[in-house]
């Protein structure tokens, strides 16, 4: 098992992860995957919905997509203060395509990128419907997104 981890680390060092953020549906290239919560189709639905601003973060190694995460910045308008709140919502922890890569490390890279992209626009970042609550624990702790 240790050899596999070392091999994964070496692969990541040889081939750096490139992260791309897509904000317009017509700019998104064809991507693999079957998870509806991180699909291009849901991106288009959010894009056409008033008050929703979707962004799709795709991780590439070379020109090959290895993971993706769909987030949406949702604007809530209320009668009482604070009247307008923007929050970033993500369903699940993304979708990953390369079994050779450590998914939690890849998620950590995507989470770092997501945080830098949305914190200036939204009040909070909320992850919902986590399939495995322990997945990404290290990345969430590192970003201080929750504490004991």
Q: How would you name each of these model-derived features?
A:
Residues 1-148:
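N-acyltransferase acceptor-side catalytic subdomain
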């Amino acid at each position: 098992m240790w050899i596999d981890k070392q091999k994964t680390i070496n692969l990541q060092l040889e081939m750096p992860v490139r992260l791309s953020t897509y904000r317009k549906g017509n700019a998104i290239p064809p991507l693999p995957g079957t998870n509806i919560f991180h699909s291009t189709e849901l991106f288009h639905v959010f894009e056409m919905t008033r008050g929703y601003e979707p962004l799709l973060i795709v991780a590439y190694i070379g020109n090959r997509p290895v993971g993706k995460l769909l987030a949406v910045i949702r604007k809530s308008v209320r009668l009482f203060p604070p009247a307008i709140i923007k929050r970033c919502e993500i369903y699940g922890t993304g979708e990953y395509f390369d079994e050779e890569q450590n998914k939690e490390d890849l998620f950590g890279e995507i989470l770092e990128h997501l945080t830098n992209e949305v914190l200036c626009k939204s009040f909070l970042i909320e992850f919902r419907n986590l399939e495995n609550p322990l997945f990404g624990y290290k990345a969430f702790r590192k970003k201080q997104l929750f504490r004991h």
